[in-house]
């Protein structure tokens, strides 16, 4: 079993990990208060792969470790054109709405809030304009951003879906 895990880790891409939020949960019982912690983490390779997860544990370190393991198992590929996204998109989750718009090189990430900025940095998008509407809780924003990013399509994918061919640029 250990040999399989080591082999899997060798093939895994170099992922950057960031903790977005740690929350303390209190359960009041007869003898006092019991504390647990939940961690929200994002992992990405800055080349188009991104994943996020939440986990709970009695210790902060354990919660982060569990969340990182879950996030690495849930990686998805996002199409990126240069340093930005191919087209405008809106991601929705619950009461959150997240608008993403491509920006010219050098603009940077124009995003309010730590959650959205973190996920865009780790996916490898450096130039994008964003706006969050509705609920601004970290998990809702991250899920809305992921919804928007997963709805992105490249020109080639759209052409294939429509059954047309793209004209090649002559240089």
Curated annotation (Swiss-Prot):
Cited InterPro entries: Ribosomal_Su5_D2-typ_SF (IPR020568), Ribosomal_uS5 (IPR000851), Ribosomal_uS5_bac-type (IPR005712), Ribosomal_uS5_C (IPR005324), Ribosomal_uS5_N (IPR013810), Ribosomal_uS5_N_CS (IPR018192), Ribsml_uS5_D2-typ_fold_subgr (IPR014721)
Cellular component aspect of the GO annotation: small ribosomal subunit
A Pfam entry, by short name: Ribosomal_S5
Gene Ontology terms, MF aspect: rRNA binding; structural constituent of ribosome
Keywords: Ribonucleoprotein, Ribosomal protein, RNA-binding, rRNA-binding
Gene Ontology BP terms: translation
PROSITE patterns in alphabetical order: RIBOSOMAL_S5, S5_DSRBD
Domain S5 DRBM: 15-78
Quaternary structure annotation from Swiss-Prot or TrEMBL: Part of the 30S ribosomal subunit. Contacts proteins S4 and S8.
Family membership: Belongs to the universal ribosomal protein uS5 family.
Domain remark text: The N-terminal domain interacts with the head of the 30S subunit; the C-terminal domain interacts with the body and contacts protein S4. The interaction surface between S4 and S5 is involved in control of translational fidelity.
Summary of the function given for this chain in its UniProt record: With S4 and S12 plays an important role in translational accuracy.
Protein name per the record: Small ribosomal subunit protein uS5
Gene (name only): rpsE
